[in-house]
């Protein structure tokens, strides 16, 4: 019987053919925790009486939400993870010395691999599906169960085939494609399903575009997002010291899908998600007509904090100045991205334009620190959520966009079409 890529990944892990709707127990290749969620997992682990990790090399802790610590509480949270990592000689522990946002850092380190089953106590764990893996977010107690047993229970998800056709125009990115998908199907349109991205557009999308798309699959309610392994994936992994051998799968031509969604990417404008849902998408053309003035532009997060994002921002900002009424904050996804951006001159361009470049952190995205919005302030942001109060005050507003839109809007002072 024909299978989707997701069904094949689970089948290989279980040792028999499994299909959508089945409840299975499955070993996990990589379990991911961060400074916010891991302390809860550690408590559950210790309360269970467990004294060892089932798969130490398959467990990563990345301190990224409030690192360097923003206050005493976050410092104490981080210490719990540090002490645990030291106690168990955890190889894959990342703090200030080798820091980054978890969903940017782990692919960089070769710790997530095609064909993997990956879970993380963070909803945007679905990012890693861009490498041809099944990757999903779970709760902290689910994480603890995997720490103890090496596996977990899953219902094999049904799949929605997203058939993307055409070559994207300049400044239309993976971020715009996923915002358009969410606009079409809504924030619960893919509930407990896999969004499988296919079609002629895929060959034109960089690995960074694919990370952005899979990252925001959860914003449509999806269990995961996935892009099959191809030459772009191969090129990205070529210089990585991979934790495991890739296991490459492709959906059968006659695999069963609950829905097929066709999108003409060639005619797609950059998309702006208006407050207060990622599904509230509008063309950047309409947004410019609406003359939406901004107080802050933010470029970063696990969605759009990669080198290509800093590159396009620098290209637009070169020789320009940020509008006097606007703050521009740029947060690279990892130290390596920061280092490369500095080497290529992007950091100087951003700073010369009046922007501020921070250390890698999730901070501003979740309204934690390093870019919180005040009462009634408006931001254009490359992050993934724009709920009420997401980046600060409950009276603030966040418009989601790609990095080119954020950069040109920072210069103009209102949401602007970069084309």
From Swiss-Prot:
Give UniProt keywords alphabetically: 4Fe-4S, Amino-acid biosynthesis, Branched-chain amino acid biosynthesis, Iron, Iron-sulfur, Leucine biosynthesis, Lyase, Metal-binding
E.C. numbers: 4.2.1.33
Q: So where does [4Fe-4S] cluster get bound?
A: 302, 362, 365
Pathway stated in the Swiss-Prot or TrEMBL entry: Amino-acid biosynthesis; L-leucine biosynthesis; L-leucine from 3-methyl-2-oxobutanoate: step 2/4
Q: Which reaction does it catalyse?
A: (2R,3S)-3-isopropylmalate = (2S)-2-isopropylmalate
Name the Gene3D superfamilies for this protein. Aconitase, domain 3
State the Pfam families in the record: Aconitase
Q: Which CDD domains match?
A: IPMI
Among InterPro entries, the record links this protein to: Acnase/IPM_dHydase_lsu_aba_1/3, Acoase/IPM_deHydtase_lsu_aba, Aconitase_4Fe-4S_BS, Aconitase_4Fe-4S_dom, HAcnase/IPMdehydase_lsu_prok, Homoacnase/IPMdehydase_lsu, IPM_dehydratase_rel_enz, IPMI_cat
Q: How is the cofactor bound?
A: Binds 1 [4Fe-4S] cluster per subunit.
Family, per the entry? Belongs to the aconitase/IPM isomerase family. LeuC type 2 subfamily.
| Quaternary structure and partners | Heterodimer of LeuC and LeuD.
Question: What is the protein name for this chain?
Answer: 3-isopropylmalate dehydratase large subunit
Gene this protein is translated from: leuC
